[in-house]
Amino acid sequence: NWFWSGGCIVNETASETLKKINSQVNIIPKNLDLTYENIEVVGKPNVILACTDNMESRFLLNDYALKNNIPFVYGVSVSDKGYILNVAKGRTCLRCIFKSSTEETCDTIGVLNSNTTTIASIMANETIKIILGAGYEKDLIRIDFWKNEFSKIKVSQNPKCPACLGK
């Protein structure tokens, strides 16, 4: 079932579905709380996608991707808003833009169903462009689903950003 697997772990369900689509793909689902102590489990993929539900994990993936020179696609869906940012060495990262891990979450305010599928589609498209070496989006993409507003926000790298400086 593509859309609902009640009681199942999402990453395992996604892995099974993707393997049905392409049996040649190598997917190793992991169900764990990502921390600075176990971040190496991510390995050295061609690209990292952050589909996590909290900013702390997103910052962790951001830092790991920059440290290891791995392109990183950030996407978030909460309430009726969605954001996507491609992070790579020498470009704006999450820590350049967001200063704190305090935020509204799907647990606290919910999420509009159409939001998640649209954000995931754009993230998939950006990932394909990265893998193919095509030009990919440099701006922060912001979508307000309630107002039907799609916008690109110019973002700048913070010259004092600890993640960008490798600290």
Give a label for each model feature:
Residues 1-167:
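Adenine nucleotide-associated cytosolic modules
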